[in-house]
């Protein structure tokens, strides 16, 4: 392990909050580059990324087509809070809704969110609000995210261990 990697690991231990992060190697692997489905360490050794950032980037790293579109959007209008409208948001919602109606025969609307755990949180709220019920079920062994609400419905000890038991809220 070279000095640069040692310094990164030391800074990680000193400055980064680990929360409920689980490292799959001890010491954790430090990656410096990526392409396609691979991550590369300081020696340019390729590692097949089975997680692909929790499936959020299953299009592959350094996808030129996607990078070009993202760069164009960042230059134009990088991000807006959800209460503001912009054409791209509405156009994407239309595409998704039309696809869902065509494929499944279901009309609906789109709720944009920042990630999977937040989507689980919002789903819990929608179900609770719509049904008035306070108990919900979740699948054994399922991963639902790391927010407090999502942790409440996971059976995984790894994600619940630091936050206590929420069995009164999920079955």
Predicted regions, residues:
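Active-site and channel-lining beta-strand-loop segments
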Residues: 28-51
């Amino acid at each position: 392990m070279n000095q640069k990697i040692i310094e990164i690991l030391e800074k990680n231990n000193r400055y980064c909050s680990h929360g409920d992060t689980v490292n799959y190697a001890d010491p954790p692997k430090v990656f410096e580059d990526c392409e396609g489905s691979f991550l590369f360490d300081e020696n340019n050794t390729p590692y097949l990324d089975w997680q692909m950032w929790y499936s959020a980037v299953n299009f592959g790293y350094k996808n030129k087509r996607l990078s070009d579109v993202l760069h164009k959007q960042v230059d134009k209008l990088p991000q807006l809070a959800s209460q503001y409208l912009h054409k791209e948001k509405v156009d994407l919602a239309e595409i998704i809704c039309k696809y869902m109606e065509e494929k499944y025969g279901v009309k609906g609307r789109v709720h944009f969110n920042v990630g999977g755990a937040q989507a689980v949180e919002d789903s819990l709220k929608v179900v609770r609000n719509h049904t008035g019920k306070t108990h919900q079920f979740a699948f054994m062994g399922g991963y639902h995210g790391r927010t407090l609400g999502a942790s409440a419905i996971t059976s995984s000890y790894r994600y619940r261990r630091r936050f206590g038991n929420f069995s009164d809220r999920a079955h």
